Amino acid sequence: MNIILNKYILVNLAASFLILLTVYILQYFFNMAPCDMCIKERYPYYIIGILAVINIFIDSHQILKTLIIKLLFIATSFFGFLYSIYHVGIERKFWTGRTECSGQNTALDIEALSAQLMNTPIIRCDEATLLFNLISIAELNVVAMTLLLILNAFVLYKKI
């Protein structure tokens, strides 16, 4: 495996690991409970980490497999970027989110209201969890996903 490709894979793996480690530390040590969307924003990092580990074991001379892995890196980064933008838009009230995540009431009777309350997550997706009273975790995720997307697109473009 060439050195640049190896570093590229390790950057993806390290970024995924560090971001997941950070959110779990925030969740379990600083009691910053994630909303439903925050939990789903972690999925691309799991996938990128798994792809990086798989890529470590693929011979870099297998061009088709390496290309497929690179495209999967880009697709996963792009999905994570779009989902993070969607979440930030909900937090900043640019648009409304799903009713089960934003606390909107759609119940018409007492039984439906009771069922909705029992199924509503405690943490609302439309309320930003701010770090240092400045930037939300979802906004930081947009930055992280943007950087990973740029890295993955650059590596594919340069055919490394």
Language model features with spans:
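Interfacial segments of alpha-helical transmembrane regions
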Residues: N2-A14, H61-F81, I150
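Iron-sulfur (Fe-S) cluster-binding segments and ferredoxin-like electron-carrier domains
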Residues: A33, I39-I54, A107-L108
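Membrane-interfacial alpha-helical segments at the cytosolic side of multi-pass membrane proteins
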Residues: I9, Y46-I58, T146-L156
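Membrane-embedded alpha-helical transmembrane segments of multi-pass integral membrane proteins
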Residues: A15-T22, I48-L51, T76-Y86, A144-L151
